[in-house]
From Swiss-Prot:
Intrachain disulfide bonds: none
Any matching Pfam family: SlyX
NCBIfam families the UniProt entry points to: PRK02119.1
Family: Belongs to the SlyX family.
UniProt-listed InterPro entries: SlyX (IPR007236)
Protein name in UniProt: Protein SlyX homolog
Length: 73
C-alpha cells in the first residue's frame, strides 16, 4: 500500500507542476505578444522619424534656381 500511495502522491505533484507550467507558459506567451506589439509600434515611429529627419537635412545638390549660370563665350 505504501508504494501505491507514494505513486499517487508523485502523480498528483506532477499534475500540479504541469498545471503551473501551462499557466506560466500562457502568461509568458502573452508577454511576448505584448512586446511584439510594442516593437511594431516603435518600428513605425522610428521609420516616421527617419523620414522626417531626411526631409530636414539640406541637400548637397543645389536647385536650378540656386545654381550660378554658366559662363557665356
Amino acid at each position: 500500500m505504501q508504494n501505491k500511495e507514494t505513486l499517487e502522491q508523485r502523480i498528483a505533484e506532477l499534475e500540479m507542476k504541469t498545471t503551473f507550467q501551462e499557466k506560466l507558459l500562457d502568461e509568458l506567451n502573452q508577454v511576448i505578444v505584448e512586446q511584439q506589439f510594442a516593437i511594431d509600434k516603435i518600428h513605425v515611429q522610428l521609420r516616421y522619424l527617419v523620414n522626417k529627419f531626411k526631409d530636414m537635412q539640406p541637400s548637397n545638390i543645389a536647385s536650378q534656381a540656386e545654381e550660378t549660370p554658366p559662363p557665356h563665350y
